[in-house]
Amino acid sequence: MHGESPIKRRESRKIWVGNVPVGGDAPIAVQSMTNTDTNDVAATVAQIQRLVDAGVDIVRVSVPDMDAAEAFGKIKKLVSVPLVADIHFDYKIALRVAELGVDCLRINPGNIGREDRVRAVVDAARDRGIPIRIGVNAGSLEKDLQKKYGEPTPAALVESALRHVEHLDRLDFQDFKVSVKASDVFMAVEAYRLLAKQIIQPLHLGITEAGGLRSGTVKSAVGLGMLLAEGIGDTIRISLAADPVEEVKVGYDILKSLHLRSRGINFIACPSCSRQNFDVVKTMNELEGRLEDLLVPLDVAVIGCVVNGPGEAKESHVGLTGGTPNLVYIDGKPSQKLNNDNLVDELEKLIRQKAAEKAEADAALIARG
């Protein structure tokens, strides 16, 4: 039962990616990207639906050629979530997906081409009310900036971004967001800090090519956590060499840890020791798997003994403290005792019951205005 986040978010202009607000007072949006062959429409739609089920707000889809652009148009008709088209090298692909109803265009200023090509993309976006993401990446900086700085640096990333922000300003186009990604945490964090002081547009956060599930999660949590704690960031994407659904889960876990978004269960669990009165690790693994479908924000404490158990349980919607027998707390008050037999089954029932009650109470509160 933790309160609102104490973080004061950076002021930014609000834009819309489809029906999802980004920036301003909007919640921080969680984004992911498909890793299917875009030309395989059925596989891509199926993966997008899995991402939607996991709670994704925005999905990016790679569009490497014109065949993929046509497939993108078919995909767009079959999903409800806003889609961002990831465009590199060929500006004509951006023009085509704009015709096909894309919700946002992601272009890389290091490879999209001459100024007249950027103008053509901007005109197409303006005519259709499509926002743009300027996506600067340490691995694809413009050649003159590589020569000037010798290697990717925070200053180089920001100079690249500002160069293209100024270009869009000259074209009187303000409906855009910006990212300055690097695989190095310190480089990315410093680049975002510098950029946040110089523009009003929303910032899309990410540590690019962060790694596999474990290492990428840690690297992203450290980098994005630093920025989000400073109020920087309007959308996030956790780049993992893993199932994209894991990106969404990790994204929400990072936001939940900072009290910036609430979705599903926030588990508080001890690492266990010889004082535990039930198998904490086994109990946690089973509960996490069984309760993935719950979307109601709920704090659940699973503590193996009475050292910290009562204190944590009293701060949770549902809390389990190990003992002989174990004691369950509901809304901070002792509720009932449970033996280890069927412990997970009984605890799951209590959590689902509490989730249903909270959902009903939240709905009534919203209805009252």
From Swiss-Prot:
The reaction(s) catalysed by this protein are:
(2E)-4-hydroxy-3-methylbut-2-enyl diphosphate + oxidized [flavodoxin] + H2O + 2 H(+) = 2-C-methyl-D-erythritol 2,4-cyclic diphosphate + reduced [flavodoxin]
Required co-factor? Answer: [4Fe-4S] cluster
Q: Which GO terms describe its biological process?
A: isopentenyl diphosphate biosynthetic process, methylerythritol 4-phosphate pathway; terpenoid biosynthetic process
InterPro entries in the record: Dihydropteroate_synth-like_sf, IspG_bac, IspG_bac-typ, NO2/SO3_Rdtase_4Fe4S_sf
Provide the E.C. number(s) assigned to this enzyme: 1.17.7.3
Keywords for this entry? 4Fe-4S, Iron, Iron-sulfur, Isoprene biosynthesis, Metal-binding, Oxidoreductase
Example GO molecular function: 4-hydroxy-3-methylbut-2-enyl-diphosphate synthase activity (flavodoxin)
NCBIfam families reported for this sequence: ispG_gcpE, PRK00366.1
General function of this protein:
Converts 2C-methyl-D-erythritol 2,4-cyclodiphosphate (ME-2,4cPP) into 1-hydroxy-2-methyl-2-(E)-butenyl 4-diphosphate.
Q: Family, per the entry?
A: Belongs to the IspG family.
- Name of the protein in question: 4-hydroxy-3-methylbut-2-en-1-yl diphosphate synthase (flavodoxin)
Organism this protein belongs to: Pseudomonas entomophila (strain L48)
Gene name for this UniProt entry: ispG
